[in-house]
Each structure stands twice: as structure tokens, then as C-alpha cells.
């Protein structure tokens, strides 16, 4: 599939998500390429007067920068107890609406923000749909730098193949917004995502992992049908 087709899918699904936000809402702003379009479209709606009195809770420095660029007022979790909606992307979505997230190394903040939302809305293009989690994407695990070696051993004992995520435009490991490292862990099979999510988080030194199980309310999928981008909704 061409880059242009993927961009079209991301834009159409992002607009559909932004259109669900109503005036007065507290909105969780996710991280990633598709969610970046959501933030842009929310800014467009504010500028046109279609929306008013919304505030955003960013899940990352990237989301914060984009929200400021497009004129979305921001608050922190010190200011709000709950959110009306959180909109976020995913790296994989299985038929049970379970997710792998964390390609942008923001999954810890995303999981916190998404858990506080009345509705957690996930936006993806069709390439992110898989039959089983772990098919194409490793499970990201945020880990304290001090604990990388013991956590690596513990993840191997769970059947994983951990690899320290390295920077692309800088030498050395990727550092999260919290100042931690990320281990990308491949598993041959994830028969029970809920159990694996708990098992990983029980390892001392792990901050959070990218398995999001039984938390997504609605998945919006951007896809190309007969040459045209359109949106499909999954909510069962």
C-alpha cells in the first residue's frame, strides 16, 4: 500500500474521531501519527467555532507541542479527575479490541490518561488489525535504567526476546518522557494478553507495558474501499 493511501486512511479516521468531540469536553490527546491528525482537526474545529470550551490532557511532549500549535488549551491530571473521552492510536488491534501500544514510547502516560476516560476511542488504519497480538509488533516495556539487566532476564523467563530500543536520530537508547528506557519484547505467542500484561508489570523495575487489555470502547478503522478512504467502527 502506498504512503499516500496510508496517509488518507489516517486522515479520514482522525477526522471521524475529532468530529465526536463535543463542546465542554475534557479530551485525552494521544501520541503518534494518526493522533497528530486528530489534534490538528480538533484545532480546526475550534478555529471555525464548531467547538468551544474543550481542554486537552496530553499523553506526551509531542501531544503537548501539537496541541499548543493548533490552539487547544491544556490541563494536567492535577486539574481534572476524569476525562470525557480519550483518543489514541495503536500499533496492533486484535478481534477482542485488545491493543499493543507504545511505538512512540508514550504508553505509560497513555495508559493512565486512557484509564480515566469515560470513553476510550482508538483510531487506526487497517494495517494495524491483527488476528493475534504480537504478530507484527513487539510489546514495549518501560523500565527504570537501573533495572534493565534484571528486567531483561525476567522477560526472557516469561518467553520473551527483549531488545533495548535505540534512538534513530541520536546515539544511545530511547529515553521516555519520564527519563526511562524501553525494552521491545517479542513473543512467539501471546495466548492470554491479560495475564501477560500483569506478569510483566509484576517484574520489579518495570514501570508499565504496552499491552492494553479490555480497555478500548470503540475502534475506528480507516481503510481504502474501492479506491476511497472510509471509516469502519468496531464496538462489540
From Swiss-Prot:
Top-level taxon of origin: Bacteria
Active site: 110
Uppermost EC category: isomerase
Catalytic reaction annotation: aldehydo-D-ribose 5-phosphate = D-ribulose 5-phosphate
Assigned EC number: 5.3.1.6
GO cellular component, one term: cytosol
InterPro entries named in the record: NagB/RpiA_transferase-like, Ribose5P_isomerase_typA_subgr, Ribose5P_isomerase_type_A
Keywords: Isomerase
Stated family: Belongs to the ribose 5-phosphate isomerase family.
Quaternary structure, from the entry: Homodimer.
Full protein name: Ribose-5-phosphate isomerase A
Amino acid at each position: 500500500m502506498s504512503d499516500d493511501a496510508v496517509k488518507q486512511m489516517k486522515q479520514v479516521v482522525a477526522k471521524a474521531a475529532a468530529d465526536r468531540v463535543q463542546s465542554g469536553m475534557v479530551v485525552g490527546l494521544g501520541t503518534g501519527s494518526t493522533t497528530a491528525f486528530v489534534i490538528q482537526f480538533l484545532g480546526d474545529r475550534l478555529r471555525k467555532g464548531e467547538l468551544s470550551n474543550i481542554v486537552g490532557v496530553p499523553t506526551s511532549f509531542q501531544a503537548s507541542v501539537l496541541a499548543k500549535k493548533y490552539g487547544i488549551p491544556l490541563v494536567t491530571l492535577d486539574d481534572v479527575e476524569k476525562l470525557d473521552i480519550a483518543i489514541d492510536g495503536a500499533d496492533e488491534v486484535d478481534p477482542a479490541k485488545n491493543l499493543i501500544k507504545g511505538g512512540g514510547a508514550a504508553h505509560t502516560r497513555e495508559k493512565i490518561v486512557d484509564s480515566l476516560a469515560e470513553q476510550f476511542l482508538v483510531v487506526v488504519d487497517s494495517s494495524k488489525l491483527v488476528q493475534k497480538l504480537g504478530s507484527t509488533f513487539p510489546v514495549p516495556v518501560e523500565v527504570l535504567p537501573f533495572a534493565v539487566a534484571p528486567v531483561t532476564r525476567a522477560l526472557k523467563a516469561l518467553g520473551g526476546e527483549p531488545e533495548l530500543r535505540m534512538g534513530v536520530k541520536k546515539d544511545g537508547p530511547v529515553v521516555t518522557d519520564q527519563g526511562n528506557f524501553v525494552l521491545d519484547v517479542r513473543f512467539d505467542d501471546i495466548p492470554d494478553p491479560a495475564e501477560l500484561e500483569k506478569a510483566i508489570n509484576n517484574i520489579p523495575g518495570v514501570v508499565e507495558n504496552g499491552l492494553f487489555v479490555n480497555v478500548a470502547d470503540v475502534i475506528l478503522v480507516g481503510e481504502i474501499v474501492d479506491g476511497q478512504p472510509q471509516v469502519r467502527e468496531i464496538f462489540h
